[in-house]
Regions:
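Non-catalytic C-terminal interaction segments of nucleic acid-processing enzymes
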Residues: 5, 23, 43, 93-152
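Alpha-helix C-cap/termination motif
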Residues: 24, 43-46, 81-85
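Catalytic cores of nucleic-acid endonucleases
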Residues: 1-8, 55-101
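Acidic-basic catalytic patches of nuclease active cores, encompassing PD-(D/E)XK
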Residues: 1-32
């Protein structure tokens, strides 16, 4: 969803997901500015330990899809952030049946289907964008953290 069309309800849901992740990972979530390429920074003891782009999908079940679409720009941003900051960068999707995540750097882009998707029912020329389809087998369901705090 474009940050320009994101609603307060969308932000509240994303914040709720960020708080759940932070509790599981023993961190503090910090929301970034609206135009940032990552939604949330995760801090522990005043140190950055991870970043995430979070999407909340209402009235949808993860199991009904064979893949999840990710904006190609979001993937680039997450991978670049991970390289620069040397912390894990995650793409997180919240569905009605759970919260699922994948570490961006583990996605082999050459094995993903690339397409152009978006809203075709709106007149704006900026409604479509390149996306990659990430197979469901790459996604992990939120669970207890490992010894380092994050499931790798």
């Amino acid at each position: 969803m474009s940050h320009l069309r994101e609603t307060d309800a969308d932000r509240r849901k994303e914040d709720e997901v960020a708080r759940l992740l932070a509790t599981t990972w023993n961190c503090e979530p910090i929301r970034t500015k609206d135009q940032s390429r990552v939604d949330t920074l995760f801090m522990r003891d005043k140190s950055l330990v991870a970043v995430a782009e979070i999407k909340a999908r209402r009235n949808r079940q993860f199991a009904t899809f064979s893949s999840v679409q990710l904006n190609l720009q979001n993937w680039f941003s997450l991978v670049q952030f991970e390289m620069a900051a040397e912390v894990p960068a995650f793409m997180v999707f919240a569905f009605d049946d759970g919260i699922y995540y994948v570490r961006a750097a583990t996605i082999q882009i050459g094995q993903c289907r690339l397409s152009v998707r978006g809203r075709t029912d709106r007149p704006g020329i900026d409604e479509r964008q390149p996306v990659i389809e990430i197979g469901n087998l790459l996604w992990k369901r939120l669970r207890e953290p490992d010894a380092e705090g994050f499931s790798r």
